[in-house]
């Protein structure tokens, strides 16, 4: 029994071994001593103090933790520091699409606001790829973001309004 415990302890110790991780977040370079398997969500929130990215489910199902990795939306709760090495990471704090943020405000999208960072990050990735997204593209791009308050019609209206302004 003691042998199993010591083996478990060694495995646990090896899996939490910290190493130097260099991240490029919102245009700045950060060096952290952290486990490369650590989800970037925890590095952002607990180490760097960038709390705009929210913890929702921890399983990549709700979209509250959506960030951009080299311009693509990813779930920060599932993406490790190691996967982010050498790539550009953008959080809600670094999102510079003011037109999209204005459309969100004009349509009163946020209610409780908890999911909005993830919603905006998914929407920003969509309009970067498709400046005038179709209804189908909006539905597809936003399908991975859950809103407990049910502001889906407002989200769609905000994105449609954004598309009209781009036209």
What are these model-derived regions, one by one?
Residues 2-167:
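Signature of N-terminal electron-transfer/Fe-S-associated modules in redox systems
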